[in-house]
Amino acid sequence: MAHILMKQLLEAGVHFGHQTKRWCPKMKEYIFSERNGIHIIDLQKTLVKLEEAYEFAKEQAKEGKTFLFVGTKKQAQQTIEEEAKRCGAFYVNQRWLGGMLTNFTTIKSRIDYMIKLEELKNNGYFDKLPKKQANRLNRELEKLIKVFDGLRGIERIPDVLYIVDPKREEIAVKEANKLGIPIIAIVDTNCDPELITYPIPGNDDAIRSIKLITSKIADAILEGRDLREKEADLQLKDEDLQSEIS
């Protein structure tokens, strides 16, 4: 993993947890101390867990697995979109619809419908309709884009989820756990880390904290995909060499 300094974590405020009265006792092992009614996260443990999550994401990407980034809280929306696009992951940053994983066939049909409506609009079909009908379809398309824009091109249930604030995204967590999909997540002091396959203890409210950790997971995916491409190139060269010899 690209080296992360303790200073970076401190500057990003990764160590600031929630109020002590809002804590989840299962986070006890990741808490360093209490300050002014706020739990302070043990950043040494954050580094260890981030390293584990990084290696897992890298290996999954190397195997060609697909990723879905989830973070619908205001502080996470921009980072989730930017980092998912940067590493070629799908994303949900506006609203998690119940059944996005457990009722994927229906969700996929809505995504296909959104794309079909876009094609009709771009081809000028809406312009030929009565104004009232065209306005209705435009509103419907806007709503679909808001929810499904980050899922364009998805063909099957994703292999790995990355989540900012699993407490807020509890429906996504439940669906992933039901289907046995591994989860990487930033877990603040009010979260249950036992629900997460690769928990990363950290502040899930500060934009800089979210950005720092999310960017590292995106880096891991990019590194894994780069390794996959290099291995594929080597295999092709070996096959070419074997054919020349024979």
UniProtKB/Swiss-Prot annotation:
<keyword id="KW-0687">Ribonucleoprotein</keyword>
<keyword id="KW-0689">Ribosomal protein</keyword>
<dbReference type="GO" id="GO:0022627">
    <property type="term" value="C:cytosolic small ribosomal subunit"/>
</dbReference>
<dbReference type="Pfam" id="PF00318">
    <property type="entry name" value="Ribosomal_S2"/>
</dbReference>
<dbReference type="InterPro" id="IPR001865">
    <property type="entry name" value="Ribosomal_uS2"/>
</dbReference>
<dbReference type="InterPro" id="IPR005706">
    <property type="entry name" value="Ribosomal_uS2_bac/mit/plastid"/>
</dbReference>
<dbReference type="InterPro" id="IPR023591">
    <property type="entry name" value="Ribosomal_uS2_flav_dom_sf"/>
</dbReference>
<protein>
    <recommendedName>
        <fullName>Small ribosomal subunit protein uS2</fullName>
    </recommendedName>
</protein>
<dbReference type="InterPro" id="IPR018130">
    <property type="entry name" value="Ribosomal_uS2_CS"/>
</dbReference>
<comment type="similarity">
    <text>Belongs to the universal ribosomal protein uS2 family.</text>
</comment>
<dbReference type="GO" id="GO:0003735">
    <property type="term" value="F:structural constituent of ribosome"/>
</dbReference>
<dbReference type="GO" id="GO:0006412">
    <property type="term" value="P:translation"/>
</dbReference>
